[in-house]
Design a protein with these regions (language model features):
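Extended, non-catalytic subsegments within catalytic or DNA/protein-binding/adaptor domains
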Residues: 1-228
Length: 228
């Protein structure tokens, strides 16, 4: 595919000591233009929306497993959703990156897929009104239960995140084949778009550098709004 060829070109550039930003707006805009002309088959996984999230958290609470595992998995899913995290970002959060404040919790992301220079960004997650689904409360409970004082807070792989999500999606009665690790991130973007969040505010939280993907989430959220 075109994306694979671009990735190959990027690898060759790196081998020769050059850096190619494959996410540069000019490259992304050209790819988007090609898609408009040629068309593309959108086979992306479904987002986990608010109601889905509540079903999943309820299932975790009812699951026959250790309390420590329940608390960890709740924290992974609630923090992953509410921060619009990529799986790679989520599993690389360290204790030192987390700061609880009056308004909620601040989490510093040292490096992400679109932050090749490693400048980092801070995600601010507020308290939720319903404490059963509050990511701040959930993360604090995980720290207290695990006793973690340094290093990675979850200590699992990004593949494990996907498996955890699929496990609880299935237990919640949803089709696990239609969801993936990315469903938390896309669910956050779609849900906030549905709630009326502006494009720039969604991008500030998710870390998207171009509007293409975010606009797709907004379009998804607006499908049944103002429908003639």
């Amino acid at each position: 595919t075109l994306k694979r060829r671009i990735a190959s070109i990027s690898v060759i550039h790196k081998m020769k000591g050059h850096y190619l930003d494959t996410k540069h707006p000019i490259i992304m805009e050209n790819l988007h233009g090609i898609k408009r002309v040629k068309g593309t088959n959108q086979s992306s996984k479904k987002p986990i929306l608010i109601n889905d999230l509540k079903l999943i958290i309820n299932v975790i609470d009812e699951e026959n497993q250790s309390e420590k595992r329940k608390i960890r998995d709740r924290a992974i899913i609630l923090v992953g959703f509410s921060g619009g995290f990529r799986r790679s970002e989520l599993v690389n959060i360290e204790y030192e990156d987390v700061e609880f404040v009056t308004e909620g919790v601040k989490i510093f992301v040292k490096r992400s897929k679109t932050d090749q220079s490693g400048e980092g960004m801070t995600k601010a997650i507020p308290h939720f009104i319903n404490s059963n689904y509050c990511p701040v409360k959930s993360l604090n409970e995980w720290f207290n239960k695990s006793g973690i004082k340094s290093g990675k807070i979850f200590n699992i792989s990004d593949k494990s995140v996907a498996l955890i999500i699929k496990k609880y999606v299935s237990l919640a009665g949803l089709d696990a084949n239609k969801y993936a690790g990315h469903s938390l991130r896309s669910g956050f973007a779609t849900s906030t778009a549905d709630a009326g969040a502006e494009e720039r505010n969604i991008m500030a939280m998710t870390g998207h550098k171009t509007t293409q993907m975010v606009r797709r989430y907004i379009q998804e959220a607006n499908l049944f709004k103002n429908n003639a």
